């Protein structure tokens, strides 16, 4: 923890430098960042699970305390307005005493609607950063989520500080423990629901604490890209298992996927081939490489795998150009990762917010930036038997290039996705996930 505290000190300095730069450019006095506030369910007296403003948790590992605020001018010690109501119905957050507390001035807010008393004078020259524009209006903010400020912050958020990298390594360590437990549960006959409970228990995090809804899919369900339905009974025949699940540490996310076959068969061989391909793509990563180009190269490598397994016929170039590989791999190669699972800034080419769209043929790619030092990205190629996409091939001449017998053999297994979390360094690539022992 002492090392993390030292890294946090440097982290805050970097964030202050960023704020100092952008408020100087925009002639602002500073930023007021709102953690957020609860959302009430319609016609009910309960709230949805609270999700903190990512710009707030970039500064502090305070992720479950709504109605809190940060006042930052880039030079003075940040002011944390920490919400601690008098409340006998709910758990009230403890007074901050962790390693980060000494780096901020703290004032306690007991009533959410009294925050104006703690905000700086001349509030119209401060920028509000947050979701609740109605609150910003009432408080007198005229600058609310300025595009220039958000673009600057989102662009630079891609470059992680050493503190952030340490947190993400820990988030991977936690998730790997869960993945190993989930794998054992699969081979021991657990249902999707039971596997998820094993995973959450192993990482000691609840469903509302993990960074995204976990995907735990058996058999054909593995072909549903964002499958979160969960079956409560085990299938009569156990064929395959795909788990896409992460963990949270100090507000930072891990995002890991693994695929398994219950028996040694063609599907197991296909997993091995995809695993090797994923590692090949990771080996191509270095500063200056286009992430979009990595995605395109993945399609060429996948085309060869489809040929090797007699899933399709033709040649690599033609399979890619005709869009056949996109039917089997319809999503993007991955995305930036950090305080959000799909971290902001993936489409920005500069700090002014210049947007670089995904290639027209690959609209679901979530990152088009050039790789640079201290960026963290996921690499997650996949191959799936998705009937709705295959049906499109049956409508034109491309159907003759599909070996439908092999497709029928693979259909009950669903699909494969293999995802690691990777740090780009100047002289190497750090695969946090594999370094922790979560291999094939």
Curated annotation (Swiss-Prot):
Entry EC no(s): 3.4.13.9
GO terms assigned for molecular function: aminopeptidase activity; metal ion binding; metalloexopeptidase activity; phosphoric triester hydrolase activity; proline dipeptidase activity
Binding site for Mn(2+) 1: 255, 335, 380, 419
Protein keywords: Dipeptidase, Hydrolase, Manganese, Metal-binding, Metalloprotease, Protease
Binding-site residues, Mn(2+) 2: 244, 255, 419
Gene Ontology cellular component list: cytosol
GO terms of biological process kind: proteolysis
A Pfam match: Peptidase_M24
Cofactor: Mn(2+)
Superkingdom of source: Bacteria
InterPro entries assigned to the protein according to its UniProt record, in alphabetical order: Creatin/AminoP/Spt16_N (IPR029149), Creatinase/aminopeptidase-like (IPR036005), PepQ_N (IPR048819), Pept_M24 (IPR000994), Peptidase_M24B_aminopep-P_CS (IPR001131), X-Pro_dipept-like (IPR052433), X_Pro_dipept (IPR022846)
Cofactor, free-text remark: Binds 2 manganese ions per subunit.
Catalysed conversion reaction: Xaa-L-Pro dipeptide + H2O = an L-alpha-amino acid + L-proline
NCBIfam families recorded: PRK13607.1
UniProt similarity note: Belongs to the peptidase M24B family. Bacterial-type prolidase subfamily.
Function: Splits dipeptides with a prolyl residue in the C-terminal position.
Identification of the protein by name: Xaa-Pro dipeptidase
